[in-house]
Amino acid sequence: MRLLRHTLWGGLLAGAAYWLVRYFRPRHSTLVLNEKVVIITGASSGLGRALAFAFARRAARVVLVARHEDRLETVRREIEPYTSDVLVIPADIAQEDDLRRVVEQTLARFGRIDVLVNNAGISTGGPFQEQDPARVEAMLRVNLWAAMRLTQLVLPTMLANNHGYILNIGSGLARAAIPMFAPYVATKYGLAGFTDTLRRELHRTGVHLTLVLPGWMHTDMITPEVEELVGRYGLPVEHPDFVAERAVLGLVRGEHEIVLGGVLARLGILAERYAPLLLSIYWRLWMTPEWVSTMRKIGQEDANGGGWR
């Protein structure tokens, strides 16, 4: 028992030291975004819109991708004062032909792709056995398959130029699973694993990958009811502008992983890694009837047409 206790404490201390070193170590910018060509999926609202502003303010050439052309045109007008060139491509990234068209039109316009931001995503909540199978399939296709396939399509031009950056927008739930979000968590675990694996595969090729792990965020995917509920547990709900700025800053610094969501999010990730039983107990306490009811309501609303970011 004493050995087990010492092992657990040693693991927790080692994990804490690792995150402290990652947080405080000096970093040096390696990427200048001026005139770089940046594709952003899910760019019509929420975090995607905030990312468009963050890149535009750094004078990047921004390619806006989402399903709704009218919303994309609104974002285009908003960011045009900051950047020399904006390309709008209405597309359903769950479709192979649309993904190919995004890459083809970008290369036809700019001749290269410097940065790919896989941001588009959909979510749903509630008990897994009650979730709509069509919605689950769409989530797998948008959150995971589309990011992998679009990355596969842009890699040839990046590898040919020995230069490229891929920014994958994951979730803190990719490192610390939460009940009532089983399919969504599965897609984010998959995206995190894909990012980690591909980063090692592309070592020394000039192509770099960064994974962003946001916490709860003010977007169309989070209702006021959920915001109020998670706030009672002491979890911050961050603004997309803050998340976008931190993501772009981490990208230009060459960071591999950017963890957001406050101290509790970091503690949750550490607990998942070094004390999973403790985290399981915590989630059992969280699973109040009110939490289950709220998540079930979200799942029903999403099944009737929840939005993509």
Language model segments and positions:
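Conserved glycine-rich cofactor-binding loop
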Residues: 44-45
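Conserved glycine-rich Rossmann-like NAD(P)H-binding loop of the short-chain dehydrogenase/reductase
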Residues: 58-74
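The beta1-alpha1 cofactor-binding region of Rossmann-like NAD(H)/NADP(H)-dependent oxidoreductases
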Residues: 69-70, 91-101, 133
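Substrate-binding pocket helix/loop in short-chain dehydrogenase/reductase
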Residues: 127-128, 132-137
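Active-site helix of classical SDR
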Residues: 151, 187
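Residue(s) in the substrate-gating loop at a strand-loop-helix junction
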Residues: 171
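C-terminal helical subdomain
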Residues: 211, 231-269
